[in-house]
């Protein structure tokens, strides 16, 4: 098969699935460590907004930023697809987003066919670094994939206690290991006849969820996700 027909060219777009912390959540979920999945909470905040020129062509926060979280949420939900979504956005600190008809802050609530809830929180800016966290809550427990810090040192002094280093400030640094795992997986796929775990259809579905989020933003109510 060709690279295109096997969907190998589309693998790189879902690097978050390859993040050691995020993928470990999936492994523990499959092993039944937290029982039945009930709720997914994803926090994704960038250190700073991209350039105005980039924002103008980005398609908006739901198609440019939250779309990655939609894919990650589906990764955890598995075959239990999301069927409805409520989305909202606002601008508080950076009013220039109003002129772009975009948002610096966005939140979405999704629900699967079987009732699993998902809350996604996005921000175009975050003073303490690249904030990337995932929480899976189940009938028997909870597992969390936390932020990656510059180091694991904690400082205690007469001025502060448990002062920690800052989080990563660039997505390539934050997902450095994820990109490496992705390349390793891609190399294995090239040497075999196997197909990737995710492909074009996953990207298409994420776009469909993003479009439904925009519909909800306008209607100010839950919308059925149109696949």
Model-derived segments and their meaning:
Residues 14-16, 44:
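Short strand-turn motif at the edge of the Rossmann-like AdoMet-binding core
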Residues 1-12:
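Single conserved hydrophobic/aromatic residue that forms the stacking wall/gate
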Residues 49-117, 121-128, 201:
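Rossmann-like dinucleotide-binding domain that binds NAD(P)(H)
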Residues 113, 186-227:
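C-terminal helix-rich "cap/oligomerization" subdomain common to oxidoreductases
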Residues 96-98, 113-183, 199:
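NAD(P)-dinucleotide binding in Rossmann-like oxidoreductases
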Residues 38-41, 86:
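Residues embedded in well-ordered beta-strands within globular domains across many folds
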Residues 9, 23-37, 137-138:
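Basic phosphate/pyrophosphate-binding loop/patch that engages nucleotide-derived ligands
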